[in-house]
């Protein structure tokens, strides 16, 4: 019987063939943490009395959740982590402004077939390039950094096929929300979701990263796009790397399969207060909105910024709008393309390299009674500020059209 991509990656990492349900030790290819979780990881290592990293070439730190530090406690945490990084000579260190950890892993480090573990639930993002990527808690992360290994229960492989091409106004976010509408939050617990794209060029890396990012929202242990010509092209264009990635065997067996006809999707939103409270934007059009956030590790990429700029060139925003590209590199590209100028002239506040309001940290949290539209990943009560506020999740085009009109708006009339 053939093997799935998950089984191939984890069998290699375990040094033996593994099957779903096996509990086994695996070797980790890439490990990472950010400022908010990193100080907990370092505390665990200090308590154990072993502040060391098994392979500094395979370890990444990024300051993003508390960047730039909004208070003295955040600054204190970053001071501690800078000292830690210097003490062990961390090579892959990204200070304030470089970008959000998951975007940096995607841009600079993760590769197809790797096992990637990081101290954040949205580590699943880098499954976009064909890696098995999973979030870990502080204790497990400390053990990984010290040994380069971790234990894992091998998840069941689940296949999602993406066929045809997305219609105008439909992006990766809508695919993620569609999956949530079908399987609900945590509906794919214990599964490694493998996604197969029928027409690779019609579903680019930015879209894939959004779906993989939100894999954790539908419960997946990992959300891995099966590498194809788009994967190879992306790595060649972005990093000058030529890869021959592994793929599933033709006779691989999955616990179940599901097919999404991309051409039949429409722009979707997740209404308050759950990621699986999914509705077509056409059903909620007209609801007044106070604030729009475009950014995060979910939707702060170049195609998101392009979509927002294309819509917002039509006028001035009627709802306050904050735009945060996910990395310095993306900000620079958006600047060169004229998107930053367009967004600024439309009345948006544009910054970069921070998680900011997505976790209710800073750079634009919502107040009591306010309604927001966000391109982020979560809309639980209190996630982006006041628990008395409401958050709708949407793609960047929907968010931009909403900012332009000051009310929830179907973006297709602007595209």
UniProtKB/Swiss-Prot annotation:
EC numbers: 4.2.1.33
Catalyzed reaction equations: (2R,3S)-3-isopropylmalate = (2S)-2-isopropylmalate
Superkingdom of origin: Archaea
InterPro entries: Acnase/IPM_dHydase_lsu_aba_1/3, Acoase/IPM_deHydtase_lsu_aba, Aconitase_4Fe-4S_BS, Aconitase_4Fe-4S_dom, HAcnase/IPMdehydase_lsu_prok, Homoacnase/IPMdehydase_lsu, IPM_dehydratase_rel_enz
Cofactor(s) required for function per UniProt: [4Fe-4S] cluster
Cofactor note: Binds 1 [4Fe-4S] cluster per subunit.
Keywords in alphabetical order: 4Fe-4S, Amino-acid biosynthesis, Branched-chain amino acid biosynthesis, Iron, Iron-sulfur, Leucine biosynthesis, Lyase, Metal-binding
Binding site for [4Fe-4S] cluster: 297, 355, 358
Pathways per UniProt: Amino-acid biosynthesis; L-leucine biosynthesis; L-leucine from 3-methyl-2-oxobutanoate: step 2/4
Gene Ontology molecular function: 3-isopropylmalate dehydratase activity; 4 iron, 4 sulfur cluster binding; metal ion binding
One BP annotation, GO: L-leucine biosynthetic process
UniProt xrefs under Pfam families: Aconitase
Assembly behavior: Heterodimer of LeuC and LeuD.
HAMAP family in UniProt: LeuC_type2
Function statement: Catalyzes the isomerization between 2-isopropylmalate and 3-isopropylmalate, via the formation of 2-isopropylmaleate.
Family in the record: Belongs to the aconitase/IPM isomerase family. LeuC type 2 subfamily.
Identification of the protein by name: 3-isopropylmalate dehydratase large subunit
Source organism per UniProt: Caldivirga maquilingensis (strain ATCC 700844 / DSM 13496 / JCM 10307 / IC-167)
Gene: leuC
């Amino acid at each position: 019987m053939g093997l799935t991509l998950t089984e191939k990656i984890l069998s290699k990492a375990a040094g033996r063939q593994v099957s779903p349900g096996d509990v086994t030790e695996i070797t980790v290819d890439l490990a990472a943490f950010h400022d908010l979780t990193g100080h907990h990881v370092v505390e665990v290592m200090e308590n154990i009395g072993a502040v060391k990293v098994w392979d500094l070439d395979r370890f990444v730190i990024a300051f993003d959740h508390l960047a730039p530090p909004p208070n003295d406690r955040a600054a204190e945490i970053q001071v501690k982590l800078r000292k830690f990084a210097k003490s062990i000579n961390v090579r892959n260190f990204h200070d304030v402004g470089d970008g959000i950890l998951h975007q940096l892993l995607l841009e600079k480090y993760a590769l197809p077939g790797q096992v990637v573990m990081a101290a954040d639930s949205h580590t699943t993002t880098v499954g976009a390039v064909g890696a098995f990527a999973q979030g870990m808690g502080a204790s497990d992360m400390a053990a990984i950094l010290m040994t380069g290994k971790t234990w894992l229960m091998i998840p069941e492989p689940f296949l999602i096929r993406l066929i045809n091409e997305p219609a105008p106004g439909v992006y990766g976010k809508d695919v993620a929300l569609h999956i949530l509408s079908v399987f609900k939050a945590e509906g794919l617990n214990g599964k490694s979701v493998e996604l197969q794209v029928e027409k690779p060029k019609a579903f680019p890396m930015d879209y894939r990263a959004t779906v993989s990012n939100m894999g954790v929202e539908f419960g997946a242990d990992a959300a891995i796009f099966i590498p194809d010509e788009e994967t190879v092209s992306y790595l060649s264009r972005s990093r000058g790397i030529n890869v021959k990635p592994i793929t599933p065997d033709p006779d691989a067996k999955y616990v179940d399969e599901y097919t999404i006809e991309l051409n039949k999707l429409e722009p979707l939103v997740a209404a308050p207060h759950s990621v699986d409270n999914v509705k077509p934007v056409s059903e909620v059009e007209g609801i007044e909105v106070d604030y729009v956030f475009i950014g995060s590790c979910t939707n702060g990429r170049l195609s998101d910024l392009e979509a927002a700029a294309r819509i917002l060139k039509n006028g001035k925003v009627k709802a306050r709008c904050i735009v945060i590209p996910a990395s310095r590199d993306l900000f620079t590209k958006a600047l060169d393309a004229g998107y930053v100028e367009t967004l600024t002239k439309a009345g948006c506040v544009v910054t970069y390299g921070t998680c900011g309001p997505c976790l209710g940290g800073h750079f634009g949290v919502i107040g009591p009674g306010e309604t927001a539209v966000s391109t982020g990943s979560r809309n639980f009560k209190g996630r982006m500020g006041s628990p008395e506020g409401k958050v709708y999740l949407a793609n960047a085009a929907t968010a931009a059209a909403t900012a332009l009109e000051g009310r929830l708006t179907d973006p297709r009339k602007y595209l």
